Amino acid sequence: MKLDYPKIALIGVPTDIGAGHRGASMGPEALRVAGIADALRSRGLEVQDYGNLQGPVNPWQPPVNGYRHLPEVVEWNRLTMDAVYDSLNRGELPVVLGGDHCLGIGSITAVARYCNENGKKLRVLWLDAHADFNTSEVTPSGNI
């Protein structure tokens, strides 16, 4: 029995706006250079790479009221939410190539919205180096 998988939509989100150190913004290109699209295709999956989203630059400022770069984080996540939601509406499986951990705000919001509108159960696979459970009251860094 052959399974029918949706097209994979690679969405690059090259930002380190929610991180305390530079480098996460290189993630999408590093994954592409490492051959993520070819690795998926070699497993029989159809892949569409939509390139990178373009968002605000990182001002590298200290936290304000417990949050670092809140307006920029909001904008990157609005862009991410729109791209992921559009991908789901095209019947694709979005794979967000980040970027830093704050992108869960936009990507998971898009999936939750899509699932709610279509009577589907929300499922998220999150791959990260560590758990990111901070609030403005407990974060030592101000990272969102």
Task: Describe the residue ranges of each PLM region.
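Conserved alpha-helical scaffold segments that buttress catalytic/binding sites
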Residues: 2-144
